[in-house]
């Protein structure tokens, strides 16, 4: 039986953290960008250990859905409302990618603003709504969820999706291997 997006995300995050064992996950500390992910405090710019942390309570896309009169795909919402985390680098069958994540509440608000801009652009171009969640190693290509179907697609910014990569976000994440920087 296929895992849900929540279970698949848990599995990938666990393997990501496990893959970093030894050297650990490091990030430059920023006192003006607080996050539950920081394992310690330090002077701004110093490297500190971090780890993905479960959101409690989970964040919500209700304001985006209300503003655009559009129901966002449930898997997409779950993907961004499960963990606080730095972006997660991964290897997919098609190449390297970076899974976008939210580091704190302010980062989530920025994601929502960018998503609204993306959806309004899609509307202006008379294209079906897609929801971005990742970057690729090819400039101008992003990973998106097709809102209507939940399929994961490769999309050039400003264009309709060109290639279906997986039937669902959970199926896509299942194919990934962690790449810790």
UniProtKB/Swiss-Prot annotation:
**According to the lineage, what is the superkingdom?**
Bacteria
Q: What is its main location?
A: membrane
Pfam families, per this entry? Answer: Syd
Location comes to: Cell inner membrane
Query: Does this entry carry the keyword Membrane?
Result: yes
**Which keywords annotate this record?**
Cell inner membrane, Cell membrane, Membrane
Q: Which GO terms describe its cellular component?
A: cytoplasmic side of plasma membrane
* Membrane topology of the entry: Peripheral membrane protein
Task: Give the family, as the similarity comment puts it.
Answer: Belongs to the Syd family.
Q: What does this protein do?
A: Interacts with the SecY protein in vivo. May bind preferentially to an uncomplexed state of SecY, thus functioning either as a chelating agent for excess SecY in the cell or as a regulatory factor that negatively controls the translocase function.
UniProt xrefs under HAMAP family: Syd
- Spell out the protein name for this chain: Protein Syd
- Native source organism of the sequence: Alteromonas mediterranea (strain DSM 17117 / CIP 110805 / LMG 28347 / Deep ecotype)
- Top-down, what is the taxonomic lineage of the species of origin? Bacteria, Pseudomonadati, Pseudomonadota, Gammaproteobacteria, Alteromonadales
Q: Which gene encodes it?
A: syd
């Amino acid at each position: 039986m296929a895992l849900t997006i929540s279970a698949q995300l848990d599995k990938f995050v666990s393997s990501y953290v496990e893959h970093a064992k030894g050297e650990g996950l490091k990030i430059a500390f920023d006192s003006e960008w607080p996050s539950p992910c920081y394992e310690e405090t330090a002077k701004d710019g110093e490297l500190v250990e971090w780890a993905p942390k479960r959101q409690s309570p989970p964040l919500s896309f209700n304001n985006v859905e209300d503003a655009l009169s559009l129901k966002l795909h449930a898997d997409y919402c779950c993907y961004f409302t499960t963990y606080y985390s730095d972006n997660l680098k991964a290897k997919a069958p098609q190449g390297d990618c970076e899974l976008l994540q939210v580091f704190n509440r302010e980062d989530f608000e920025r994601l929502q603003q960018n998503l609204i801009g993306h959806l309004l652009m899609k509307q202006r171009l008379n294209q079906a709504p897609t929801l971005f969640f990742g970057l690729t190693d090819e400039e101008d290509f992003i990973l998106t969820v097709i809102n209507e179907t939940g399929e994961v697609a490769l999309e050039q910014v400003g264009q309709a999706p060109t290639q279906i990569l997986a039937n669902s976000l959970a199926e896509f994440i299942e194919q990934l291997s962690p790449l810790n920087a």
